[in-house]
């Protein structure tokens, strides 16, 4: 190594040390300060959307951090089939070791949609066995049995053929949903997020203010967060909502055990709804404050690594033009949403019209 190369290496190393020190100072310096805490408390008292974000944080950020649940998932799924299909795909595509997780996630999407979970427009009548004659009656509170499984509300239907009443509890307990194996996008995303975590994958829950949810997974191969929608068996197609579905959206937020982030820029390219539920400055503060809270017990190496990952994502989200998109979204693919009945999709504005 020449003297110049040694000097350059030394300067580079020193620069990285200073940058690391600056990052750690930013994260540690004001974390939990009385000023930030006071601002946060004031914000959630005065702003309804801020309270909603805080509620989602409490509900979602640690929901899937449960080793006992992981064991239940792995006992239920057909692991032989899953890994056999992954190995075949890896071999057929001559994939490298670092690509293995991507192929695993793609197979989990396929298996979950095609072999494991089912979509429920309406439940089947317990007497005649079909949903053909069911008509909507209304909603009801969960009974004592249903309430055991975090049931928010119950849809009630009456069969015009038999007269029987059928209840459809909207469970939020993912372990209960592993038994029922049916639902709509909320139930699907809930269980699939747990499945991703059970396989040791770095996954997070994505919430859209206009009533849709999906997942993201951090790909070691692609070195970025990848969009996943188990309802559509969709891998890395973040613009299917605004483009293929023609869905109107305002806010899209990510929740995991180490971050709360506004990822709207990844998903909203057209049909933008007004973002007036909270100021951009206050939304950024909310996300940063909650993320710092999640990371308060992390060591310096973890804080620095995550901060670098965050910065990489921030830069990518600034590239909102389609020409700069690195995803594989099928902009000329199927128009409208695949999952759900035609009437339901039209009602939600997700049929591509």
Curated annotation (Swiss-Prot):
Cofactor: Zn(2+)
InterPro entries attached to this UniProt entry: Papain-like_cys_pep_sf (IPR038765), PNGase (IPR050883), Transglutaminase-like (IPR002931)
Residues bound to substrate: 232
Subcellular location: Cytoplasm
Reaction equation(s) it catalyzes: Hydrolysis of an N(4)-(acetyl-beta-D-glucosaminyl)asparagine residue in which the glucosamine residue may be further glycosylated, to yield a (substituted) N-acetyl-beta-D-glucosaminylamine and a peptide containing an aspartate residue
Record-linked Gene3D superfamilies: 2.20.25.10, 3.10.620.30
EC id: 3.5.1.52
Family per record: Belongs to the transglutaminase-like superfamily. PNGase family.
Protein name: Peptide-N(4)-(N-acetyl-beta-glucosaminyl)asparagine amidase
Native species: Kluyveromyces lactis (strain ATCC 8585 / CBS 2359 / DSM 70799 / NBRC 1267 / NRRL Y-1140 / WM37) (Yeast)
Organism phylogeny: Eukaryota, Fungi, Dikarya, Ascomycota, Saccharomycotina
